[in-house]
C-alpha cells in the first residue's frame, strides 16, 4: 500500500508540474509541447537486475492513461514515453539521447537509479532539458548551482543512513555493525550517512562488503560479514540482492539486528522471494511526499 501511494504521488506530482507550466497556458511552447500534446520522457529498468522497478514506469503510464481519458491536462494529452535501460548506464545514455534528440520530449521525469542518472546528469544539463523527480536519493541531486536542470525526488540516502545510525546508538550502543552495499554512489552515500551518524562511534562498523550490479549473488559477501562477528547488519541493496541477503542470512544461521534501506522495503519484490519467515524482525523506513 505504501509503495502504491508513493507511485500515485509521483505521477500526480508530474501532472501538477505540467498543469502549472506557464508555456502551456500562454500558447507559446518549448520543444515537446503543442496545442494537442505534451511529451514526457522516462527511463526505468524493465529488464535486467533491477527489473522489479519496472512497475514504476507501468504505474505512471497507467496514471497518465487515466488522465488522458478524462481530457488530459489543460486540454492536452500526455504522451508518456517510457524506455528500458536494463539498469545499464551506457543504455541509459542511449535512451536519453533518443528521448531528447529524436522524440524531442519536454522533459525527463522519474528516471530511476543512481548509476543510471549519473550517466546522463551532465548531458541533460548541457542540453538544458529538465531532468526532474530523479528517482534516486543520491546526495548529488541537491547541487542546484552546478546542475540547475536536475531536481531530485526523495529524501537523500545520507540522511537515511544517519537515521539508522541514531536508532542503533539509542537501542544498542555497543553494536558491532556489518554493512553490505552496492559499489557505486548509491551504496556509498548510505555508508557515509551511517558513518557520519555514528560520529566518533564509527568504529562500531566491524566489516563492509560491496557487490557489483553484475554479480549474480552476494553469498560470498554474506559469509564474510557473518564471520566478522557482527550482531547488527545494514543491508544497502536493491531488491534482487536484498532478497538474497535476507535469505542468505537465514541459511547461514546468522541472526543480527537487520536494517534494510527504504529502496528495498518491498513485500512483493523482496520479502516474498526472500521467504516471509526470513524477513521477520527486519527494520526499515519509508517516506511520503
Predicted regions and their residues:
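Short, low-complexity disordered leader/linker segments with a strong preference
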Residues: 1-39, 69
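Beta-alpha junction/loop-to-helix N-cap segments that form part of ligand/metal-binding clefts
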Residues: 26-28, 37, 52-58, 70-143, ...
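Short beta-strand segments enriched in small/hydrophobic residues
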Residues: 36-55, 176-180
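Active-site-proximal beta-strand/loop segments in catalytic clefts of secreted hydrolases
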Residues: 43-46, 83-86, 110-113, 134-137, ...
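Glycine- and acidic-residue-enriched helix-capping/strand-helix junction motifs
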Residues: 49-59, 185-189
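Short helix-capping segments at alpha-helix termini
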Residues: 67-74, 127-129, 198-204, 250-256, ...
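Extracellular/periplasmic Venus flytrap/periplasmic-binding protein
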Residues: 91-94, 139-142, 148-253
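Extracellular/periplasmic periplasmic-binding protein-like sensory domains
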Residues: 249-289
